[in-house]
């Protein structure tokens, strides 16, 4: 990974508590960032707290992002980044690699997480993170991307 320019690992697993990977990254000279993607309230709160740092990290590039399989939580994390941050900067939506219609899956879990993050961001800040119309439009774009055969 170092030879390919990776400087940052983003670990999306909420259910993994060992320090093994963070210590391995540290020994290898790679930064490690845990951004837990899970539906339980404690993890949603953590995601929202870390969201600005996560966005900055993605913007900086040269990262490797993964969960256990590298598909489903990755889709959720990158869609959350796009809906609540990157779309406003003119960045294209991420390709959907895990929750794809041609793989027999739907975007229901992505939508569930986006709805939950929207709700918690609104409650935390006292104002909607984006207008409801924009939010719905962006969710529709993600749904359409999941139907595409282009990855």
Name the predicted role of every residue range:
Residues 1-63, 83-94, 109:
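Cysteine-based protein phosphatase catalytic domain of the PTP/DSP
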Residues 12, 150-151:
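Short linear motifs in intrinsically disordered/low-complexity regions
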Residues 18-20, 73-76:
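Short catalytic/ligand-binding loop motif for oxyanion handling, primarily in non-cytosolic enzymes
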Residues 66:
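Short, surface-exposed ligand- or partner-binding patches at beta-edge/loop junctions that are enriched
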């Amino acid at each position: 990974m170092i030879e390919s320019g990776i400087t940052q690992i983003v670990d999306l697993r909420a259910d993994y508590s060992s320090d093994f990977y963070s210590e391995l990254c540290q020994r290898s000279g790679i930064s490690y960032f845990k951004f837990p993607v899970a539906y339980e309230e404690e993890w949603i709160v953590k995601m929202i707290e870390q969201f600005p740092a996560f966005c900055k990290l993605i913007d900086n590039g040269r990262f490797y992002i993964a969960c256990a399989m590298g598909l489903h939580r990755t889709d959720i994390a990158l869609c959350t980044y796009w809906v609540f941050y990157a779309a406003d900067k003119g960045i294209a939506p991420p390709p959907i690699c895990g929750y794809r219609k041609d793989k027999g899956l739907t975007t229901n879990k992505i939508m569930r997480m986006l709805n939950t993050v929207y709700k918690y961001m609104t409650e935390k800040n006292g104002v909607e993170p984006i207008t409801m119309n924009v939010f719905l439009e962006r969710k529709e774009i993600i749904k359409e991307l999941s139907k595409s055969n282009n990855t």
